[in-house]
């Protein structure tokens, strides 16, 4: 069943009225960031012809988690601090007895039944929640997120990495590796270029870890009250928790990885054609959330 578009009439004026009242004391005018991010999203949707393009059905809302008590909706995006936000929601909803989100293991946070999904509600409940609750997502540079997924899922040595190697890696190597490459080493590690060739040829929707945010969260079809960014997540999380009257809850510190530092190293392995083709696959995420190539790779596409 289709879910009709819910209009919240968000505007910069509304932001100026709301955010000063809920911003943490040490935050520097977070509502100004929201004005910029909301305008970027609105213009991106309109300029790309994506406004209301997707007809939203119930099963498309699987990534939106629900906290009825705090009237909060969170669209989780893998590789964008979603483990910590899932932990926080488990504390907020009482699904966990923990008082500190970091006490909840990552495996527990990712259990399918750890938090209620919007798609599990009735259609009237979904419409009411979208109308009345605070809906937010966290964005990240598409290429940074993609590299994080590759390194975590294909270069690791744990149960989850082994699953990805078996589920995707063997197929990618079989189809995209040149016969002579690594013939003597017997390497079963997918190279970054092989992974990118797989995405270019077969699409980016085979797994949620590299599916674009545009497809996971439907930002041009649903009205988001708050757009967070991975780069500013400590301040953004504090603002959101203040908005839902949970200021004492501390968002776990985000682990400082080396993904951003490694971007140029990995992307230098790709041809210009491959980078352009990959950009097209994630173009909506780049334009909706205001990301570019220059700040990551040192150049932009002409």
Sequence positions of predicted segments:
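Membrane-interface amphipathic segments in extracytoplasmic regions
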Residues: 2-302
